Amino acid sequence: MINPNPKRSDEPVFWGLFGAGGMWGAIIAPVIVLLVSIMLPLGLFPGDALSFERVLTFAQSFIGRVFLFLMIVLPLWCGLHRMHHAMHDLKIHVPAGKWVFYGLAAILTVVTAIGVITL
């Protein structure tokens, strides 16, 4: 017999954040690392393309704040989701593991939001 009131799972929300963080980490983050870690120190940017004033102006704009927020939060959720499932796969059972890992991700998301807003 089919249960008319099945228990809803919260896993799709966490899988969505995990997937978004994985895509961000695979597509956007390497480009930023390439730009900031390799091309900028080697002087491959024209003039003041990434001067302090321009980067600060971008970071303080709405789009810049959203970008910084996503650059920090999405890989964070991806990593903590991966750690949660890695512990499960290794048979290391963390008491209330879902609360520990996803709670930490939620707390760090709030801290990041406060930091980005006050930037």
Swiss-Prot record:
<dbReference type="Pfam" id="PF02313">
    <property type="entry name" value="Fumarate_red_D"/>
</dbReference>
<keyword id="KW-0812">Transmembrane</keyword>
<feature type="transmembrane region" description="Helical">
    <location>
        <begin position="99"/>
        <end position="119"/>
    </location>
</feature>
<comment type="similarity">
    <text>Belongs to the FrdD family.</text>
</comment>
<dbReference type="GO" id="GO:0000104">
    <property type="term" value="F:succinate dehydrogenase activity"/>
</dbReference>
<comment type="subunit">
    <text>Part of an enzyme complex containing four subunits: a flavoprotein (FrdA), an iron-sulfur protein (FrdB), and two hydrophobic anchor proteins (FrdC and FrdD).</text>
</comment>
<keyword id="KW-0997">Cell inner membrane</keyword>
<keyword id="KW-1003">Cell membrane</keyword>
<keyword id="KW-1133">Transmembrane helix</keyword>
<protein>
    <recommendedName>
        <fullName>Fumarate reductase subunit D</fullName>
    </recommendedName>
</protein>
<dbReference type="InterPro" id="IPR003418">
    <property type="entry name" value="Fumarate_red_D"/>
</dbReference>
<feature type="transmembrane region" description="Helical">
    <location>
        <begin position="25"/>
        <end position="45"/>
    </location>
</feature>
<comment type="function">
    <text>Two distinct, membrane-bound, FAD-containing enzymes are responsible for the catalysis of fumarate and succinate interconversion; fumarate reductase is used in anaerobic growth, and succinate dehydrogenase is used in aerobic growth. Anchors the catalytic components of the fumarate reductase complex to the cell inner membrane, binds quinones.</text>
</comment>
<dbReference type="InterPro" id="IPR034804">
    <property type="entry name" value="SQR/QFR_C/D"/>
</dbReference>
<dbReference type="GO" id="GO:0045283">
    <property type="term" value="C:fumarate reductase complex"/>
</dbReference>
<dbReference type="GO" id="GO:0005886">
    <property type="term" value="C:plasma membrane"/>
</dbReference>
<feature type="transmembrane region" description="Helical">
    <location>
        <begin position="61"/>
        <end position="81"/>
    </location>
</feature>
<dbReference type="GO" id="GO:0006106">
    <property type="term" value="P:fumarate metabolic process"/>
</dbReference>
<keyword id="KW-0472">Membrane</keyword>
